[in-house]
Amino acid sequence: MQKNIYVLYGGPSTEHEVSITSARTLINNLSKEKYNVNAIFVRRNKKFIMKENITEEIKSDEELILDTDLSVIESVSECIRKINPENTVIFPAIHGSYGEDGTIQGFIKVLDLPFVGCNVLGSALCMDKGYTNDIFELNKIPQAKYVVLCKNDDYNLKEIFEKTSKAVYVKPCNAGSSVGVMRAETEEELEKAIQNAFQYDRRILVEEEIIGPELQIAVMGNDNPVASRPGVYQIHDVEFFDYDAKYNDSKTEMLTPFPMDEKLELKARHLAEKVYKLMSLSGFSRVDMFVKDNELWVNEINTVPGLTPHSMFPVLWKCTNDMSVSEVFDNLIGLAVEEYKKNKAYKLER
């Protein structure tokens, strides 16, 4: 019997377009023999539109941009009515706010359906980089020195540099794909970067610059997660790995696996698994960390990592254990069902 898969994508975040590309990769690599594949597009205005029973290849992102005249509530209700609750798994591919902050996960839990990826708590904790760093600090996870600022805080630029380093990165706490990130070495640059980051979020993070390769490690699993071999994006002619370098720069190269000392690689993989469990994650995530002088610093966790042709997550499993993209997605769907059944087994009454 075919499973009904509903790929949920789009959303109101700054990573809307990336989500559409991830959804296309997903839809095209899900076996149409195993699955009845459906797509649910969430417009920027939060209207839901469903494309049912997809059997042909989606050749462009434009095919997945859908519209409706219904209101938000009407469109959501219409989609819920169309979802077959039997033998069904929801596959969220919404990046950034709304998709990675626990919002959509809570919505699906209300529907009492299995879904791929992290739970509400893990998603919410990892979405805010400031809170993530606070938890890392309490648990002695190695990371860059940092300062969190809120919109109406008083701050001293000189003190921020003293608490971090002579060069820093400023980023919104609740954005991904390097949206709103700027580097600063002077007080003038820092003030400009702070004001820029506050355009995207009311909480921002100022972090010490660590110069060294940024490892990306895919992690998959529920109670017993497994980390992939590390990969690195090699970038050219840009200061850091920004949005354009991630998705638009043809010169950006993937090094998978990243050549490094065998013991250090094993340490990095174990560290990725450790923070995955620490943050109460399930399904899948990507853990990013810097390596310098044989030391590791965890940077961030992406609970809905990119699944585009330029994304690291599926490629890392190919170089780790020769899994195809389709096999990765099959595994994630299986993990979703496993987690759902486990949670349903817990008592809700005394």
Curated annotation (Swiss-Prot):
GO terms for cellular component: cytosol. Residues 133-334 form the ATP-grasp domain. Mg(2+) 2 binds at residues 300, 302. The lineage of its organism: Bacteria, Bacillati, Bacillota, Tissierellia, Tissierellales. Its cofactor is Mg(2+); Mn(2+). It catalyses: 2 D-alanine + ATP = D-alanyl-D-alanine + ADP + phosphate + H(+). Mg(2+) 1 binds at residues 288, 300. Cell wall formation. ATP binds at residues 161-216. HAMAP family: Dala_Dala_lig. NCBIfam families: D_ala_D_alaTIGR, PRK01966.1-4. This is D-alanine--D-alanine ligase. Its EC number is 6.3.2.4. The gene is ddl.
